[in-house]
C-alpha cells in the first residue's frame, strides 16, 4: 500500500488537527465510538483493506462487459459473488494487508460486475427512486440534471464534518435527485449543477489518491448528492490503489439495485434521514414515498457496515419529523451514531419567498434543539460524540 504522510507533513497535519478540531483526536478515546466504528477505524489506520480494494481481487468467470450477458445474467453473477465476498474479505482481513500483495488481480472481478450493472442502470435511468428513465448514456440528463458526464464542483479536506471523519477528503458532485426548497448547496445541486469540472473516472481516482496522501481519513462522496454519479464512482475504484475508507454521504433516495451495488464497497455510511413522514418530504423536497425508501436503505446500510445518521432539526418540525425519525433509529438501527444537527438556516427558495414556507422560514429555536436532545436521551441514542 502507498505510504501516506511522512516526516514534517505528518507533524503539520497533527498540529492542524489539534488546533482546529481537537475533538477529531479525542473522540477515539470514547469506547462506544471506537466499537461502533471499528471497521472504519481499522481501514482509516491502514490496519485493514478498504472493501473496494478487496472487491477487485474477487474473480468472476465471465466477462461482465460482454454484450452477450443480460442484466439478469449479471445480477446472478453479482449475487453469487456477494455471498463469496463476505468470507473472502474476512479471510484477507485475518491475514492482514500483506495478503493482498501476494494475490494477482483477476482478469475480471466482482467490482467489474458492479461497474457493468451500474452503467446499464443509467440507460434508461433507474439508479434513484425517481426512476425517471432518462437516456443518460445518450447525453440526456435526468431529473438530477446529470447525464453521461461526471461533474465535480470541488474537493478538499473538510474540517467541519463529524469528529471521527475529520479531516474528510470531501468531493462535491453536481446535481441532486431532491429539490429541497431550503437547500444550502443549491448552487451545485439545482441552479448550476453542470457548471463544475468534467472529470473522467481515472481523474476522479487521482483526486481520491491525492486527498488520502495529504491526510484525509476517508473519501467523502457528497453533493448535491452522489447517487447519480454511482457508475462513475464505481469505475474510479478500478484505478484507485491507495487504501482509504469510502464514505457515502447521501439522502439515500436510491433503488434497491443501487444499494446492492454499493453495499460491499462502502466502509462507512453518512445518510440523512430528513423527514418523519411523506407529506413533509413532498412539500419541502418534492419526493414521493420518502419514508419507506429512506428507512429501507438506511436499514440496509446499518446492517452492511459502520454508520453515522444525520438528522437536521427543522423549525416547527420536531413532532412531525424529529420525534418519529429518532424513534425509528432507536428501534431499527441500534448501532448507529446520530448527529442531531442544529445548523438549519433558511436558504434558496425559502430565503427568497419566506411567505411560501413560513414553517421553515426561521432558524430552529434553542428549545426545539433541546427537545430533540431530550427525545434522543430518552431513547438511548448516542449522539453527543458526533453532534
Language-model segments: residues:
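N-terminal pre-triad scaffold of radical SAM enzymes
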Residues: 115-131, 148-185, 338
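Auxiliary Fe-S-binding modules of radical SAM enzymes
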Residues: 1-136, 302-305, 312-387
Amino acid at each position: 500500500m502507498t505510504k501516506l504522510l511522512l516526516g514534517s507533513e505528518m507533524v503539520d497535519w497533527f498540529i492542524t488537527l489539534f488546533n482546529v478540531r481537537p475533538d477529531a483526536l479525542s473522540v477515539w478515546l470514547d469506547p462506544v465510538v471506537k466499537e461502533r466504528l471499528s471497521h472504519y477505524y481499522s481501514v482509516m489506520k491502514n490496519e485493514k483493506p478498504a472493501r473496494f480494494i478487496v472487491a477487485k481481487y474477487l474473480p468472476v468467470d465471465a466477462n461482465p462487459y460482454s454484450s452477450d450477458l443480460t442484466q439478469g445474467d449479471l445480477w446472478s453473477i453479482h449475487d453469487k459473488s456477494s455471498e463469496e465476498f463476505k468470507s473472502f474479505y474476512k479471510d484477507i482481513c485475518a491475514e492482514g494487508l500483506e495478503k493482498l500483495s501476494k494475490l494477482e488481480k483477476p482478469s475480471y472481478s466482482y467490482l467489474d460486475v458492479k461497474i457493468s450493472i451500474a452503467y446499464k442502470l443509467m440507460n434508461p435511468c433507474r439508479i434513484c427512486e425517481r426512476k425517471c428513465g432518462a437516456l443518460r448514456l445518450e447525453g440526456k440528463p435526468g431529473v438530477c440534471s446529470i447525464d453521461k458526464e461526471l461533474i465535480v464542483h470541488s474537493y478538499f479536506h473538510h474540517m467541519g464534518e463529524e469528529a471521527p471523519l475529520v479531516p474528510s477528503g470531501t468531493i462535491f458532485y453536481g446535481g441532486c435527485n431532491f429539490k429541497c426548497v431550503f437547500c444550502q448547496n443549491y448552487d451545485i445541486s439545482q441552479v448550476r449543477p453542470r457548471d463544475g469540472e468534467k472529470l473522467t473516472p481515472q481523474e476522479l481516482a487521482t483526486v481520491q489518491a491525492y486527498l488520502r496522501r495529504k491526510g484525509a481519513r476517508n473519501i467523502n462522496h457528497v453533493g448535491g448528492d452522489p447517487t447519480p454519479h454511482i457508475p462513475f464512482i464505481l469505475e474510479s475504484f478500478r484505478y484507485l490503489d491507495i487504501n482509504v475508507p469510502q464514505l457515502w454521504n447521501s439522502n439515500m433516495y436510491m433503488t434497491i439495485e443501487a444499494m446492492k451495488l454499493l453495499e460491499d464497497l462502502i466502509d462507512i455510511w453518512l445518510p440523512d434521514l430528513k423527514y418523519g413522514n411523506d407529506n413533509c418530504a413532498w412539500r419541502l423536497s418534492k419526493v414521493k414515498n420518502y419514508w419507506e425508501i429512506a428507512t429501507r436503505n438506511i436499514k440496509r446500510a446499518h446492517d452492511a457496515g459502520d454508520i453515522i445518521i444525520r438528522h437536521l432539526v427543522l423549525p416547527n418540525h420536531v413532532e412531525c419529523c424529529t420525534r418519529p425519525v429518532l424513534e425509528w433509529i432507536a428501534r431499527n438501527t441500534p448501532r448507529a451514531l446520530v448527529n442531531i444537527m442544529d445548523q438549519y438556516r433558511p436558504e434558496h427558495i425559502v430565503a427568497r419567498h419566506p411567505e411560501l414556507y413560513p414553517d421553515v422560514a426561521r432558524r430552529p429555536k434553542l428549545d426545539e434543539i433541546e427537545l430533540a436532545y431530550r427525545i434522543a436521551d430518552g431513547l438511548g441514542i448516542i449522539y453527543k460524540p458526533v453532534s
